Amino acid sequence: MRTHLSSLLLCVQLAGCATAGSVEAAQRKPLPRQTEPATIAVDLREAGRHLLHVKLVLPAQEGTMALVYPKWIPGEHAPTGPITDLASLQIRAGDTLLPWRRDNVDVYRFLVDVPRGVSSLNLTFDFISPPSGQPGFSSGASMTQGLAVLSWNQVLLVPEGAAPESFSLRPSLQLPANWKDATALEQESRAADLVSFKPVSLEKLIDSPVLAAEHLQVTQLGENHGAKVSIAVAAETEAELQISPAELKGMQNLVAEEAALFGARHFDHYQFLLTVSDGVAHFGLEHHQSSDDRLAGRALIDPELSLAGMGLLGHESVHSWNGKYRRPAGLATPDYQAPMKGDLLWVYEGLTEYLGEV
């Protein structure tokens, strides 16, 4: 992760000022057994209006059920889940619209009374992406007329207590016409602009953002101990996609140096997801098999901007080892609602910054 330190400190201070009180009780019982993956379908066709449409099918069982929106996001180290951008939530059992209520204390928690005999819930809602210029990670500006970065934590509600490593979902994505996409997720099928991915755990889904754009180009950078490494670049124009020979050589050297430094790899493949646009928030956010990297629109064609921005790629890819493969205990929480403890954040970020620059 790279951003302004003051923003991170502010988030930590706000987290410490949370109102005390007890969470409204939903009857605690074992989660409904998953006989098949939950499904999540995201429609990106109105990304130019900063609007996503979401459909979820979740397992359910009779009684009061709690659904939660991811709050503490890995790599952001703070309770920054963009709950304020969720809108128009409707929950149905079949064709029956069910009333729901917000928890009186925890605004990331929703309660719904599930009728007898109901085994699944159908949810629909919208995600309103912030306008250009809005800072933040998954709460920052992520869409323009020509491109979008989807962080799955933006568009998820899951049963409370769902284990990230075992709760399974089948994701799909409806793209605008003629757009391309890049992600660490494995594609199962594609029909025109509808992309279906193989089922994955909740943990892997949130750890696998999608870069989509009309102008998108993928370039192979080499291998790290047998695993292919590539970079996907999305931009507002074709001209801004172009990687110079010097930049390409630097990226290839980065892959080779990391292979030599760490001596092994823990991913099946790795892809830099690089957005070059003045319409999105600028930062880097690490993931296990990819990184969400965002730079100014001319970052690849302006030599000064290019030199300043290339260090971001080294920082975020090092995080795949230091921060993802191995994570400080206080940041390895059991789910996305449990608070993180940042007492070892200096190792997570400090060592990564050093190695990334080297």
Task: Name each model feature, range by range.
Residues 45, 57, 74, 79-267, ...:
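Non-catalytic architectural context of zinc metalloproteases
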Residues 26-72, 153:
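Early extracytoplasmic/domain-onset interaction patches
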Residues 54, 87, 121, 169, ...:
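Residue-level detector of short, conserved catalytic/binding motifs and their immediate flanks
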Residues 18-20:
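Bacterial signal peptide processing site
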Residues 258, 347-357:
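An active-site-proximal "capping" alpha-helix that borders the catalytic cofactor pocket
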Residues 6-16:
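Bacterial N-terminal signal peptides
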Residues 220-344:
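Juxtacatalytic substrate-recognition/specificity segment
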